[in-house]
Each structure stands twice: as structure tokens, then as C-alpha cells.
Curated annotation (Swiss-Prot):
It comes from Syntrophotalea carbinolica (strain DSM 2380 / NBRC 103641 / GraBd1) (Pelobacter carbinolicus). Disulfide bonds: none annotated. This is NADH-quinone oxidoreductase subunit K. One of its GO terms (molecular function) is NADH:ubiquinone reductase (non-electrogenic) activity. It is a multi-pass membrane protein.
Length: 101
């Protein structure tokens, strides 16, 4: 049984909006990273859902690539968060103003 594409798009839209709200409203770097990951998962869900709907495997392959890129992104971002926590003592983004002119 294939889930209708409209339902897949609705769920993906809700996930994307939830991730976007998390990114925009949170000041903690880890919570922002979780929001970005939720948004990436929503995009992957759209790719897999559309791929199943049109019975074409390209969307699933791109979703697999997206998962690999997301894993690399999480690894780098968490390394940066650990570095910032050790060097500055906080992960609140309001405290990072070193680039201001």
C-alpha cells in the first residue's frame, strides 16, 4: 500500500515548519542544529514519497545522499559546538559577537 502523495507532503510540510520554528526561536546551538536536522529529514521524506508515488528510484537515491550529507553536517556542527563550549563557556548564540565590526 502506498501512502497518498498529499499526505506525505502534508507531513513533510509540518516537519519542515516545526524545524524552522525551532531554528528561528531557539538561542541554543544544539537546539538549532536539531531544527536543521528536522528540516533535512522533511526534505528526505518528500524525496522518498515522490519517488514511491512515481515509482522511480532516483528520489530514493538522492534521499540516501541527503542522509550522508546530513551525517557529515552533524559531525562538523557538533565538533564546532564542543569547541565553542570549551573556548567560550556557553553555546548561547547571543554571546557570539566576535564577527561584529
Amino acid at each position: 500500500m502506498i501512502v497518498p502523495l498529499g499526505q506525505v507532503l502534508m507531513l513533510a510540510g509540518l516537519l519542515f515548519v516545526a524545524g524552522l520554528v525551532g531554528v528561528l526561536l531557539r538561542r541554543n546551538l544544539i537546539m538549532i542544529l536539531i531544527g536543521v536536522e528536522i528540516m533535512l529529514n522533511a526534505v528526505g521524506l518528500v524525496l522518498v514519497g515522490a519517488s514511491a508515488y512515481w515509482r522511480h528510484p532516483d528520489g530514493q537515491l538522492v534521499a540516501l545522499l541527503l542522509m550522508a550529507v546530513a551525517a557529515a553536517e552533524v559531525t562538523i556542527a557538533l565538533a564546532l559546538v564542543v569547541y565553542l563550549k570549551r573556548s567560550r563557556g556557553t553555546i548561547d548564540i547571543n554571546r557570539f559577537d566576535g564577527m561584529k565590526g
